[in-house]
């Protein structure tokens, strides 16, 4: 996304100003996701629908993968997403490394911390041991991957700021897959599946 944006919107690029139309592709709404799941599994539960939304964020590609794998319920969806060879396991890395370039390790660390609940710059800086202000600004403004949120009950003029990931798929990927890469390298995917199932209720509750 950011690469295409630079090609057409950066004054230094040869194609600057030649864009004749812009189409923004947005994820499916929950209503559309519900219709898709109902077409494949009329007896789906609200838990199945929630899991589909949390795993895919409404992105057509990810929904299609699950539907083609006949992963229509929560357990099947999680099992497929975390199974050996699943496209879900490498998607975050494949999608973002080329975007971030040589700084990808710093960006990945920041996104992983936010997904794990370290949502203030002070917390992130203290763990990474460097000022991450410029990285956070890029993640918000250039890549549109995070956004600022105000804590509940904060005063309107409060400067307290927290960050959250905007994409549900990436939130799941950084929370469970990227942070447990060592388990996957040992090919013990079943342990990761058990970990996700153990923490799923708390994780899904935070996103409702």
Can you name each region flagged by the protein language model?
Residues 20-48:
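Conserved small helical "lid"/interfacial subdomain of P-loop NTPases
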Residues 1-12:
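Sensor-1/coupling segment of RecA-like P-loop NTPase cores
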Residues 44-49, 53-65, 104-107:
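The conserved phosphate-sensing helix
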């Amino acid at each position: 996304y950011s690469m295409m944006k630079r090609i057409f919107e950066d004054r230094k690029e040869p194609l600057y100003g030649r864009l004749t139309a812009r189409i923004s592709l947005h994820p499916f709404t929950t209503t559309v996701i519900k219709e898709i799941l109902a077409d494949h599994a009329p007896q789906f539960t609200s838990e199945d629908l929630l899991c589909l939304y949390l795993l895919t964020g409404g992105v057509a590609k990810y929904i299609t993968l699950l539907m083609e794998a006949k992963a229509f319920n929560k357990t099947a969806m999680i099992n497929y997403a975390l199974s050996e060879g699943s496209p879900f396991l490498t998607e975050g890395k494949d999608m973002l490394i080329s975007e971030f370039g040589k700084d990808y390790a710093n960006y990945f660390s920041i996104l992983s911390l936010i997904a794990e609940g370290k949502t203030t710059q002070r917390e992130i800086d203290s763990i990474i041991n460097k000022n991450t202000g410029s990285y956070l600004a890029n993640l918000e403004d250039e890549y549109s991957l995070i956004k600022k949120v105000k804590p509940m009950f904060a005063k309107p003029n409060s400067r307290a700021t927290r960050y959250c990931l905007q994409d549900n798929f990436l939130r799941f990927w950084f929370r469970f897959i990227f942070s447990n890469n060592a388990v996957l390298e040992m090919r013990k995917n079943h342990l990761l599946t058990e970990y996700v199932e153990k923490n799923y209720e708390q994780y899904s509750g935070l996103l409702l």
